[in-house]
């Protein structure tokens, strides 16, 4: 969802023609209700004021966040115009004042420090170099002590999980970008980017493989 080259980003289900059915597919196949609500709970537990969603897709997280905390200040950024159009319509229908920006992180977002950055089902779709770039940019944009919350495919730790991941995610998004996630690369990438307090908070076994939630913080020493 978030690549430097606008012509090269991966649409939500791997193909632009599938974007209209993205919400239904994710709800059916990924236990979305469980992990999205866990993301919302984690965001709100920190009492955050400014929330940025990298690769905000069709806006499902924004709507859930609004329902749980109507005054939360949410901005989503995504390069996919079709997905952003759906997100804006969904937010307007729910009454949410969420802001959605068509563009690439971090260039499309004002440079003010952010309390919490969240990203879900994005990093597995981009190259290893792009995963590193996104995480480095997230660290740079966070306030010292600010948190990054990720929900994405991680280590596929059983034969069944690997089979499901290959049959679904990799059949749509390809192997080159997704395999590092399946090999469990995310914690080491977070450490390499400079995050501290890295924690695997939860994981969900789904029909598409194992999805993890990771929490990490920008060190307070970054204020110096």
Q: Model-derived features: where do they sit?
A:
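Class I SAM-dependent methyltransferase SAM/SAH-binding core
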Residues: 52, 58-106
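A short acidic, Gly/Pro-enriched loop at the edge of an enzyme's catalytic core
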Residues: 109-116
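C-terminal lobe and adjacent flexible extensions of AdoMet/dcAdoMet transferase-like proteins
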Residues: 213-224
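Nucleotide donor/acceptor-binding cores
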Residues: 48-49
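A short SAM/SAH-binding and catalytic strip from SAM-dependent methyltransferases
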Residues: 116-129
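Conserved class I S-adenosyl-L-methionine
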Residues: 1-45
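A short glycine-rich, Lys/Arg-flanked "PGG" loop and its adjoining helix->strand segment in the class I
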Residues: 132-144
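C-terminal alpha-helical "lid/dimerization" subdomain adjacent to the S-adenosyl-L-methionine
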Residues: 6, 151-193, 198-206, 212
